[in-house]
Amino acid sequence: MTAKTFLLQASASRPRSNHFKNEHNNIPLAPVPIAPNTNHHNNSSLEFENDGSKKKKKSSLVVRTSKHWVLPPRPRPGRRSSSHNTLPANNTNNILNVGPNSRNSSNNNNNNNIISNRKQASKEKRKIPRHIQTIDEKLINDSNYLAFLKFDDLENEKFHSSASSISSPSYSSPSFSSYRNRKKSEFMDDESCTDVETIAAHNSLLTKNHHIDSSSNVHAPPTKKSKLNDFDLLSLSSTSSSATPVPQLTKDLNMNLNFHKIPHKASFPDSPADFSPADSVSLIRNHSLPTNLQVKDKIEDLNEIKFFNDFEKLEFFNKYAKVNTNNDVNENNDLWNSYLQSMDDTTGKNSGNYQQVDNDDNMSLLNLPILEETVSSGQDDKVEPDEEDIWNYLPSSSSQQEDSSRALKKNTNSEKANIQAKNDETYLFLQDQDESADSHHHDELGSEITLADNKFSYLPPTLEELMEEQDCNNGRSFKNFMFSNDTGIDGSAGTDDDYTKVLKSKKISTSKSNANLYDLNDNNNDATATNELDQSSFIDDLDEDVDFLKVQVF
């Protein structure tokens, strides 16, 4: 019997143990109670007393085991949790207790609930939404702004009452005032709406220095029965700046704004004789006019009017004084006569400047004659040395030309005298500096400024130029050494600088050693190799000398 058959018999007689099968048999299929059994005599039902009543405790919960873990069922959507239905812990004892104080405890609980509800309501009131807060802040700002405008209107009324001799009573059309009040009530909280009264308050500050006739022509206020003509519509539109105007106003304005295409008076049938389309456009585009349209028959005295400057005076006469040219008051008026003289003078001088007129933008402000200030011709030439002014140190155009011509002459003379210093910029700078020091017309600061302005001013060389110049010198010296005679002594040895002297001394010392090496190696085949070695060693020595000179020079 072989060993193989013995092993087969032994394996057949050995009992097989299925580990997984045994474990499967050990898993309990019946439910197993985790808590102690209620039927056992040791774990009988427990009794306890609570206000004289006895209750039995329920049996413990039995959990069924399973192979797979399963999640509990999901609650239905919209189902409230049990925490909302539970009563507070303080109220449970009151419900269970039965006695004479039960009514008092219930009353106290009701009072506590009312107080808690009030506290919650007060907290909810404190939490105001953000948009309501912004609306409140906006209303506060608007009220403050309206209070400021009211104060400004009171100040303007006081000023108008003090200047009643110049100003005249104003009027406002009923249709426009009702439209203005309606818009003010509708868009009070709108920031984009610009109120007409705000423009009135702003423009009254601009025109406090002279209260004059705001309309370019004299016309009577419109009555309730008569309709507004084109001129009244234009004058009213100059004061209104609302985003959504009346449709009738916009219709008439669109008809009248096309005056430059048909420039005749048929488009303005009800306008006065002296009215021009340019004045209507200036009324529309100029927002510096007061909103309350003041109407006057004539200006009593032009000398009483005060202007801020000459330009404002010319603007006033060009716009508003055209109507009163035929009055007797203006014939003996000095202000009017001076204005006419200034107009004649400026039109004579500037007749060629105003030949081309823009028809698309025919505003009267563009064609106003501007008085030019007379400047003395000798102001630039006369320079007082006592006055400490920066303009006194700057050279004029004539002196600058003289300095440039003088520098040009000096450059030509220096080229003839010294040929070697022809391209030397430092020599030219020093020569210009010496001659500028001797001049009596300019001081040191003036000489530096003139040198900076001249064509021949000194500019220091850049680093790249210095490096290129140095590389050229090194290449030239090495080339002269390699292709010169053995002695290497030229006739111009007296004019050499330190750099060339060092190179020549190095060349003389190495040339003698090279001659000996050439004599020894004439008959050998390795003469070229020794010559190359000697040249490489010489180049290394030359580089060391150049580095030494760089340190000494720079």
Curated annotation (Swiss-Prot):
Expression induction or repression: Its expression is glucose-repressible.
Function: Acts a component of the CCAT-binding factor, which is a transcriptional activator and binds to the upstream activation site (UAS2) of the CYC1 gene and other genes involved in mitochondrial electron transport and activates their expression. Recognizes the sequence 5'-CCAAT-3'. HAP4 encodes a regulatory subunit of the DNA-bound complex and seems to provide the principal transcriptional activation domains. Does not bind DNA directly, but augments the binding of HAP2 and HAP3.
GO cellular component, one term: respiratory chain complex
Result of altering L466A: Greatly diminishes transcriptional activation
Biological processes annotated in GO: positive regulation of transcription by RNA polymerase II; regulation of carbohydrate metabolic process; regulation of cellular respiration; regulation of DNA-templated transcription
Region feature (Activation domain 2): 359-476
Organism per entry: Saccharomyces cerevisiae (strain ATCC 204508 / S288c) (Baker's yeast)
Highest taxon, organism lineage: Eukaryota
InterPro entries tied to this protein: Hap4_TF_heteromerisation
Start and end residues of each stretch annotated as Probably encodes all the information necessary to anchor HAP4 to HAP2/3: 1-327
Region (Activation domain 1): 124-300
Coiled-coil intervals, chain numbering: none
Record field: compositional bias (Low complexity): 101-118
Keyword annotations: Activator, DNA-binding, Nucleus, Transcription, Transcription regulation
Region annotated Disordered, chain positions: 1-127, 393-422
Assembly and interaction partners: Component of the CCAT-binding factor (CBF or HAP complex II), which consists of one copy each of HAP2, HAP3, HAP4 and HAP5. The assembly of the HAP2-HAP3-HAP5 heteromer (HAP complex I) occurs in a one-step pathway and its binding to DNA is a prerequisite for the association of HAP4.
Biased composition (Polar residues): 36-47, 84-100, 410-421
Subcellular location: Nucleus
Main location: nucleus
GO MF term list: DNA binding; RNA polymerase II-specific DNA-binding transcription factor binding; transcription coactivator activity
Full protein name: Transcriptional activator HAP4
